[in-house]
Amino acid sequence: MEIFTIKYNASLFSNKTLRDKVYKILKENTKSYYESNSNGFFRIGGISRVDYINNNSIYFKGECKKYFGKNEVIITNFWIFKNESLADKFYNKMLKEYGNKSYIDKNPKLKYYNMSEIINYSVEMYDKDVVLIKEHTKDIKLFEVNVSMG
């Protein structure tokens, strides 16, 4: 397991409530493709676990070589929804546009969309409480993380 670093623009986290909410969710252990927990957290990706957060860096361990064949690629797209129905709505939209459930079921360990498809996907903000943290590069270990409110 290698350690990767996500760097984000600290000014995007000037809202302490938003920052704390994001921190709390990022610290949660995560598993695979489609998951909601009591915080209304929905994610697409393959991050095993957030390791720790220090200053403006989020350190996490990932197994991207196992998934992609090279160490420097990992999915870091996070969507935080107000409730599970919004997550379901988005999930169904993603299935319709990018794949089908049979494909997902046949690849239980991968469970992600092709990076080239997902990376530039423009997410519709369904609700003012939906937060998007979206990766905008896929070939280096350092990721800039954007946060926006719908």
Curated annotation (Swiss-Prot):
What's this protein's name?
A: Uncharacterized protein MJ1484
Name its species: Methanocaldococcus jannaschii (strain ATCC 43067 / DSM 2661 / JAL-1 / JCM 10045 / NBRC 100440) (Methanococcus jannaschii)
